[in-house]
Curated annotation (Swiss-Prot):
Family annotation (PANTHER family): MITOCHONDRIAL RIBOSOME RECYCLING FACTOR PSEUDO 1, RIBOSOME RECYCLING FACTOR
Main location: cytoplasm
Organism of this sequence: Magnetococcus marinus (strain ATCC BAA-1437 / JCM 17883 / MC-1)
UniProt cross-references to NCBIfam families, sorted A to Z: frr
Keywords noted in UniProt: Cytoplasm, Protein biosynthesis
Name under which the protein is recorded: Ribosome-recycling factor
Cell location: Cytoplasm
Keyword Protein biosynthesis: yes
Length: 185
């Protein structure tokens, strides 16, 4: 019972870490990245669609994203969606392609982004700790029902704590890396 429990907890913790990395990918740094536009939804063909399903995106230079729609009729909708996405971007449409220049981040904006990144990391740490709590409760319930011995419960609790510590460390490493990217001028 205990080994599958540990594997299940680690899978759940891994999902939390993956969700954090997805959120971090949408946080703007000084360099252009197509992942910045992943959350943009375009009103295309009568429904809301992710930008990457109606256009291809490239990064021709460090602070520019080019969005090439597959249907030129969607240029206006794509430009409007990027402008309305509240990313602080000002796209321009030249009739063939939507160019999205990334303005230089101010020191104040960088600090705001670092605060946002820390908020994301704290939410992820809370999720990991809740997963740990679920695991320990499961172990205590199993011990109470005489499914495992008290020694086995303590051994497994240590394994759960080690997994938790490992994932908290991975979260911290991801945050330090993202913070360095944001603060780099």
């Amino acid at each position: 019972m205990s080994i599958p429990l540990i594997k299940d907890l680690e899978q759940r913790m891994n999902k939390s870490l993956a969700a954090l990395k997805d959120e971090l990918a949408t946080v703007r740094t000084g360099r252009a990245s197509t992942s910045l536009l992943d959350a943009v939804m375009v009103n295309a063909y009568g429904s809301m669609m992710p930008l990457n399903q109606v256009a291809s995106m490239t990064v021709p230079e460090a602070r520019m994203i080019n969005v090439q729609p597959w249907d030129k009729g969607q240029l206006g909708a794509i430009e409007k969606a990027i402008r309305d996405a509240d990313l602080g971007l000002n796209p321009s449409n030249d009739g063939q392609i939507v160019r999205v220049p990334l303005p230089e981040l101010t020191e104040e904006r960088r600090k705001d982004l670092v605060k946002l990144v820390h908020k994301y990391s704290e939410a992820c740490k809370i999720a990991v700790r809740n997963i740990r709590r679920d695991g320990i409760e499961g172990l205590r319930k199993a011990e109470k029902n005489k499914e495992i011995s008290q020694d086995e419960m303590h051994t497994q609790e240590k394994l759960v704590q080690e997994s938790t510590d490992k994932f908290i460390k991975l979260i911290d490493e991801a945050i330090v890396s993202k913070e360095a990217d944001i603060m780099q001028v």
